[in-house]
Amino acid sequence: MAIQLSKGQRIDLTKTNPGLTKAVIGLGWDTNKYSGGHDFDLDASAFLVDAHDNCVNDLDFVFYNNLEHPSGGVIHTGDNRTGEGDGDDEQIIVDFSKIPAHIEKIGITVTIHDAEARSQNFGQVSNAFVRVVDEETQNELLRFDLGEDFSIETAVVVCELYRHGGEWKFNAIGSGFSGGLAALCRNYGLQV
């Protein structure tokens, strides 16, 4: 059975799961009834950052227009433009054995595409979650339900995977940002 985490909790991934080399980071959400006339398009992204919490270059930003990190260590499986259906709406596959040595952390985020133009925000999103699944066994290792703590935010840092003592750990963040994808890019040291 998967471990259920709360905001701010940290847990070991690779030490307590020997042999874990590839993990599927599954993200899901529902949108509340909304009469704004536009569909919601939520997008998952991964920011691979160094010890200074910055991406070294644009290729360290994996998202719908850059589906794979050059190392092959992080792969976005594609953009789900509707978020309809049960289960994961988008997935990011992390192969810990291929992550370059200078990468200390992987920030997993979700943004709302064209949020400002469509008058959309995370206050209109419910049942958001992230889960980590062992790709080989398909066992769900952990789950973090984000709750309903958002109002005007258009981007969320959902979680971080980070190195500590030669192992990979998971940090349940759940921190909202205004300013969408551009604000997140600036947060991780990218020019927009």
UniProtKB/Swiss-Prot annotation:
InterPro entries for this protein: Stress/Tellurium_Resist, TerD
Pfam assignment, any one: TerD
Disulfide pairings: none
Family: Belongs to the CAPAB/TerDEXZ family.
Protein name: Uncharacterized protein YceE
This protein's encoding gene: yceE
